[in-house]
Amino acid sequence: MLVLIQRVSQAAVHVDDEAVGQIGPGLLALVGMEPGDTEAQLRRMAERLLGYRVFADEAGKMNRSLRDTGGGLLLVSQFTLAADTRSGMRPSFTTAAPPEEAERGFNRFVEICRENHAPGVETGRFGAHMVVSLVNDGPVTFLLRP
């Protein structure tokens, strides 16, 4: 499992010209599931995601987390994130979880995040062609692994 997070002023995801998820200030998280991701890894990633300090404190240092700020969280599944890009000129997706396994894992990850982040968690639509828009704040971008 890997999650690419971006600190945003706002973000939204549309499917067929319909907004299916949107947030104000917070984090956009692109989520790539890998074969064999476990419940423990999902829980660890949720803890890291909600506790990762990427927001400024009073002194301007990145010392506050999403949990501290109460910001929004937009989770978007993205199997291409788990691609093997080590060789050649075309990505291989053998390192990404198969669709059914990935959907189960992503949905469980969303549940865990919702249980632990009362201010709200929005999502895209698994497996759909999505148009993601965001206003990057910083930019501040990190790749997290459990």
From Swiss-Prot:
Coiled coil segments of this chain: none
Keywords assigned: Cytoplasm, Hydrolase, RNA-binding, tRNA-binding
A Pfam family assignment: Tyr_Deacylase
First and last residue of the signal peptide: none
The protein's assembly and partners: Homodimer.
Family to which this protein belongs: Belongs to the DTD family.
Protein name: D-aminoacyl-tRNA deacylase
